[in-house]
Amino acid sequence: MYRHKLLRKLYNYRPSEGEEQEALKETTAFVETYKDCFERSCPVGHLTGSAWIENFDGTKFLLSYHRKLKFWVQLGGHPEPGEHDILQVALREAKEESGLKSIVCLHPEIFDISIYRFSDGKEPPHLHFDINFLLKAVDPKETIKVSDESEDLRWFSEPPQYDGNQDVDNIFRMFNKWKQHQQRSL
């Protein structure tokens, strides 16, 4: 039952061409097939909720220098046990990982979809089916606070430099979508 809300979002989503189209197809099939798609115990993988967060005036976006991955990524994470609303997962994770309480959803529909192969040595290799939403930190007086999951948090106006060893096409794709969103909002 709880998968239906997410499946409606997936069926209505129009991805960018290429890699994201394939990610949408695979994510939709995963959610249709696995009733435990929100649970970390699902052997194939699980859903994660992430956030592209813009600042109060829409001029910058927030990224985390991830403690385990060792490069800049959008904020996000796993559903808690029994949590089945992926937008709420993204909002909760964004607030927890940034320390910002004023984060709101700019649009309740999916902003981007990616799939990551994950292996940390503690768990068997599995997939993260990552659903991203466009969020906004609306209070200009709030300051970001680095959580245990990050080494750093920073507002950017352009994507950071990467050394070429990371799969970060999604960061550039989301940056371009965000710029298009800003143009439409003018």
Where are these regions (language model features)?
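Generic N-terminal amphipathic, Lys/Arg-enriched alpha-helix
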Residues: 3-14
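Active-site segment of metal-dependent pyrophosphate-handling enzymes
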Residues: 99-141
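Acidic, metal-coordinating catalytic segment for phosphate/diphosphate chemistry
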Residues: 12-50
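Compositionally biased, intrinsically disordered linkers/stalks adjacent to structured regions
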Residues: 173-186
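Short, well-ordered beta-strand micro-motif
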Residues: 53, 134-136, 154-157
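NUDIX/MutT-family hydrolases
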Residues: 143-174
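Conserved Nudix-box catalytic region and its N-terminal flanking loop in Nudix hydrolases
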Residues: 59-100
